[in-house]
């Protein structure tokens, strides 16, 4: 497993969230990771390969914190204060692309086609899980993923289950480019913090393991219902209505079915408690978009004319705390959002 994460910079003066490229010195890159430039948004981080979700969470934090340039002697860029993992802000989108393979040599096309069938009708759930762009062009909107709603026709083209092509901008595609081994690529998720990316990897790894074992596809829906769920997930996030075998379900009930169906695969992963907390929070109506929304809503009340600057300042501190090893709860608290206790929330 691996990810490509696109993101914004937080620049001075004014803690402005911008497209400015953040470029760490290449000598601090570890083998297998790249600091690169995306044509659309600018800054992109290409991770090394992960084999476990615990490894993914640790290495994502370790890799992404290298973009705190002010901490390095030879990677400083003037006026860059921090970075922001958001799916959208002004007028550009930032996304996360997941790459899945079955070994060092990648994944053959036939196996990728089979795995894509297992994943396809869960795509709306993954959109809801990772929705993280409620702000667009300086306005707090009612939508969870403006990036997906406004950019999917160009950057995440809809596919039908059973159709897997090499077209780069399909929402799920067979990625066989350059010298890298071929992978199955999923492009639907907003740019996000490591906890949400690793949570998505939990579900993708569980589905992949079930596919390898020869288990049946867990969810098959009519294409028209898939399209409805896809749109619902981008608009409403955790409040969306999804479909499981063409039956309407809320996101919490859908999540429970996922944990029931893939219980053996998930139990065998040694999923960290902080990732289980992500799922528990999702079950009670909180994802990345909701955390950002609550923070922005509070700041609009207290600083109606300068709420974006205050959000940028809070986010700069919050993301440093998170990537330095603290939890999602600390991140949310630094943004002024108190997350509810989830000790009694059960999954599955």
Give the positions of each predicted feature:
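C-terminal accessory/tail domains of diverse enzymes
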Residues: 1-80, 86-89, 117, 128-348
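Long, hydrophobic, well-ordered secondary-structure blocks that form the structural core
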Residues: 78-126, 130
